[in-house]
Amino acid sequence: MESYIKLTGISYGYPRSRFALRDINMSLNRGEIVGITGENGSGKTTLGKIIMGILMPDSGNIVIDGVDGKNLKLCERGSKIGYAFQNPDRQLFAANVRDEIIFPLEIKGMNKTLAQEKAAALLGRFELSHLKERVPMRLSRGEKQRLVLAATLAQEPGFLILDEPATGLDRDRKKALYQLMEELAREGIGLAVISHDLQFIEHHANRIIRLENGKVVDDGC
Amino acid sequence: MMAAKIDPRTKIVLVLCLTSMVLVVENLAFVVGIGIISIACALLMGVQLLALIRRYQRILILLLTLSIVQSIFTPGPKVLFEVFGIPLLTEKGLEMGIKTFVRMLVILTSGVIMSTSNYRETIQGLIQWKVPYKIAFMTALSLRFIPIFTEEFQDSMVALQLKGIDFKKIPFGKKTQIYVYLITPIILSSLKHAEEIAIAMESRAFGAYQSRVEYLVLRLKGYDYGVMIAAVLLSISYVWAALMV
């Protein structure tokens, strides 16, 4: 498998807090589903935010798609790695579902017809076509998560980080999410699923990374 | 520090005097004078000038830009600067620009003066001034939500950038479009917060009893009365002097 994200000696401490991520070394590859698990407060979300560049590590290096993370701006990282927040509300901006996918593409200069075609395809894939005129904030949690994923995939990232994607989903929706993750992995997109739902991770991840008090205690690679 | 002990009600009176003066007075020198007085008052209240400039750097730049734009678009008989015979800056325009900047600066400084008091104490001050509890409570709530909305705004900025949008590279026309997208979730989230708070308040029987007991009770000291009387008298004298010139 092709290595896409490489973390070497990453450490991070929150100001005025005893919690810290300590000496994180790992390689995340395209085409694999990695489950990042651990107790509440073990550092899973912090690790995801460091990979995305939302938080800057105190020490260590991150290489993304062969480029040193220090040389990548937030928007450049966003084009390489898609990130779905724990709370989907934070990633919804537009007045309707279709526009949620189209507007970043248009702002970045994509032709309107092409952007619309892309949005239609993604809405179809995520079973959101019938909701295309609805206000994103008024959707159910599961629908919001699917919309966030669709909008993220519209950027064509090489890797996806999903923070607690199964939260609030019923059994059928979890199954659908798993199938989607498998499909994406087959297409060559890497996935890191941050979750404390060990059962979900154990059933669906190719590799499990377990964090405890900010340290990797198990990397099943 | 005595400044820290000053009652929030005294600060309200001071701020009312400053903002009223700056709106009533038209003479340029006197307007600038009020600007200087407001900064002096902020310093006396323990505000760090450098930290203040650093904190409000962007707003100050915005205020300055607005003032320059106003200067340019205000016509007047005495032209100070022109390009190919087209007057760009007139004496009246310059005066208007300076006055606009100082007026907005005084409003900003007034906010800073009020922020030197704990917001709970400010609200308590209003309650003791017989402002209806419901209105005072709503004001307190809105102040409490400012940091939450700031955090949400910052999260939205990050989330937009993670969509591959580079704020620095997008053209001006599209930038305004971006701000609409940024503001939309904040408006929707504030409506959601309001709805949730209303339900929580109803469920805790807010306003069920007419009388309330207070844990925090503010008492005006001698120097509070001194500052209030001095502020009112000096303001009246200042406005009178400005109108007489």
Please identify what each model-predicted range represents.
Chain A
Residues M52:
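Helix-to-loop junction immediately C-terminal to a conserved catalytic motif
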Residues L160-D163:
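Catalytic Walker B motif of ABC-type/P-loop ATPase nucleotide-binding domains
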Residues V135-L139:
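Conserved ABC ATPase signature
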Residues T113-L131:
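Conserved ABC ATPase "signature" region
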Residues G60-D68, R77:
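Conserved ABC transporter NBD signature motif
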Residues S195-H196:
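H-loop/switch region of ABC-family ATPase nucleotide-binding domains
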